[in-house]
């Protein structure tokens, strides 16, 4: 009661006090209105003329700092899966789970939709039906635990899951061609320039693998940060993880609107990546997509125990998806409606999404698993690239042969099915001008071993062969890409030349250094063409830079051949 009485006394007050209070309130309201309405520093008064230094209010849908997406706690190590158990079909119907992605359109066409159907390819040709479910959450555990017959995943995920994933892979469904993107601040020109920056990503999917793969090829170490309060690590690319790739891009879009963004980009997939760029007022761009970088391969994963007990059913799944892929490749207009209905898209949307995938046929599948694919990543190549990209995250890597099972593909080939099909993967070019006119996607310094003071490669040095394989992989996984070999020599003796003969001798020796560096780059080019007869010589260019661009004070590092990789976008 005593407290209540005091409050009442304070409420009454004097008339003069009330008058002063009223004046104070009016003054505060006026000041607030002035501060709100006056032009913001660094921004024009007219909304249409706002500069990138001061993003327009409400750019992020009126979201406040409290509404910014929160990072998730990163998983240490690899994902834990439920215990392995065999899948048992019910009523002769196989349960398969996919995500909303046009690359799985062949399965839908073969099934005539999502629901089990006696009119499906599977029912008519092999006597079983398929029920297709769609979820965006990972389905590795349900497959492992016997709740699914099969699911769609990517090769890189298999490397992460390792021996705990009790599945076999009998089929490549296709390649993603443009769906995965790295979006960055406008001023970032290459993957190498991501060192010391932080990107938003999602963990253990193809988007994380994509950026880890690129960073690894550029020689930029990756470090996982718990949140945006962690300081960027000099010389390393920091990754902050979000619930999924769309949320990661939401976080980057939000940060773009702040005065001091803590994110330099995001890794995700369409359409969210493109929406972020379009809404950035020119502050963001697509650094690279996988349109012509074929390292994201979708595959069918089948419960191992089920596959072992039912090889004919697995053959039916493989055959049906290949047939659906054929129909979508050869007669897309006749089957767009089926795909669109399953995903809740318009036919125009379905057509656009299908343009971002390459649906694999039988000969492409056989080359994919055999490692003879010349214009894209192979099963073993992508698997091992993922092991290298994830590094210490994968404590005990599995062998890719643990998963690959080509018996169904071999059986179809013996039946002489799809004999008219050919491997048909070509570059998709959307911009004008030669690739070498722009910035390289990344550059990689390689220290080839040469005979002393010459441009002759040391033939007995095994490292040289490994380095040649590295350059070949660049050309293999990216149709239409080119490499520029830039030779460099050491500048250690420049002071000695200057002392001996002044600037005239320095200039004379600089010309010789330029020619030696060019000859060394040519030697690498010739060795590539000799080792890999199928390489198109027009995709390799050379230049000598002499001692003009030292990597530092280390003489060994200065004697190098720099490989710049230009991809088509």
Enumerate the language-model features and the residues they cover.
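Second-shell loop/turn segments in exported
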Residues: 94-95, 129, 196-202, 303-308, ...
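Secondary-structure end/capping motifs
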Residues: 310-397
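N-terminal hydrophobic or amphipathic helices and topogenic motifs
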Residues: 6, 11-138, 144, 361-440
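A non-catalytic structural micro-motif
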Residues: 479-488, 504-550, 559-569
């Amino acid at each position: 009661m005593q407290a209540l009485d005091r409050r009442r006394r304070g409420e009454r007050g004097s008339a003069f006090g009330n008058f002063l209070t009223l004046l104070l309130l009016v003054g505060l309201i006026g000041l607030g209105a002035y501060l709100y309405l006056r032009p913001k520093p660094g921004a024009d008064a007219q909304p249409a003329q706002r500069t990138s230094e001061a993003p327009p209010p409400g750019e992020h849908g009126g979201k406040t700092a409290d509404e910014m997406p929160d990072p998730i706690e990163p998983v240490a190590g690899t994902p834990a899966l439920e215990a392995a158990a065999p899948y048992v079909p019910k009523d002769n119907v196989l349960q398969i789970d996919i995500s909303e992605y046009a690359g799985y359109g062949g399965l839908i066409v073969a099934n005539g939709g999502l629901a089990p159907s006696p009119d499906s390819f599977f029912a008519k040709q092999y006597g079983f039906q398929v029920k297709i479910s769609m979820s965006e959450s990972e389905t590795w555990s349900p497959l492992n635990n016997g709740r699914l017959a099969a699911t769609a995943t990517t090769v890189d995920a298999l490397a992460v899951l390792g021996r705990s994933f009790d599945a076999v892979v009998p089929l490549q469904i296709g390649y993603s061609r443009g769906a995965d993107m790295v979006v960055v601040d406008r001023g970032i020109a290459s993957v190498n320039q991501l060192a010391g920056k932080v990107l938003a990503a999602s963990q253990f999917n193809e988007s994380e693998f994509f950026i880890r793969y690129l960073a690894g090829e550029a020689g930029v170490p990756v470090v996982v940060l718990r949140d945006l309060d962690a300081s960027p690590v000099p010389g390393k690319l920091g990754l902050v993880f979000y619930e999924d790739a769309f949320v990661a891009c939401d976080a980057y879009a939000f940060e773009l609107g702040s005065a001091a963004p803590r994110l330099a980009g995001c890794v995700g997939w369409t359409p969210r990546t493109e929406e972020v760029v379009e809404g950035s007022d020119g502050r963001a761009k697509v650094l690279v997509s996988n349109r012509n970088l074929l390292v994201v391969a979708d595959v069918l994963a089948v419960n191992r125990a089920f596959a072992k007990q039912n090889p004919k059913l697995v053959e039916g799944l493989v055959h049906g998806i290949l047939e659906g892929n054929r129909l979508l490749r050869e007669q897309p207009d006749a089957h767009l409606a089926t795909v669109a209905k399953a995903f809740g898209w318009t036919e125009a949307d379905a057509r656009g999404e299908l343009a971002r995938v390459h649906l694999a046929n039988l000969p492409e599948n056989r080359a994919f698993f055999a490692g003879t694919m010349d214009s894209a990543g192979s099963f073993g190549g992508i698997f091992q690239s993922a092991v290298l990209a994830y590094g210490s995250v994968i404590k005990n890597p599995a062998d890719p042969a643990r998963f690959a099972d080509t018996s169904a593909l071999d059986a179809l080939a013996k039946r002489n099915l799809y004999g008219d099909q050919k491997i048909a993967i070509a570059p998709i070019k959307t911009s004008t001008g030669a690739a070498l006119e722009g910035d390289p996607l990344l550059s990689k310094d390689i220290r080839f071993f040469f005979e002393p003071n010459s441009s002759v490669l040391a033939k007995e040095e095994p490292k040289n062969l490994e380095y040649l394989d590295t350059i070949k992989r660049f050309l293999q996984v990216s149709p239409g890409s080119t490499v520029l070999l830039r030779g460099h020599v050491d500048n250690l003796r420049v002071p000695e030349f200057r002392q001996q003969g002044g600037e005239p001798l320095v200039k004379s020796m600089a010309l010789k250094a330029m020619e030696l560096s060019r000859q060394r780059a040519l030697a690498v080019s010739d060795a590539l063409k000799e080792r890999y007869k199928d390489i198109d010589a027009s995709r390799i260019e050379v230049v000598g830079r002499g001692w003009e661009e030292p990597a530092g004070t280390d003489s060994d590092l200065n004697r190098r051949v720099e490989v710049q990789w230009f991809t088509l976008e």
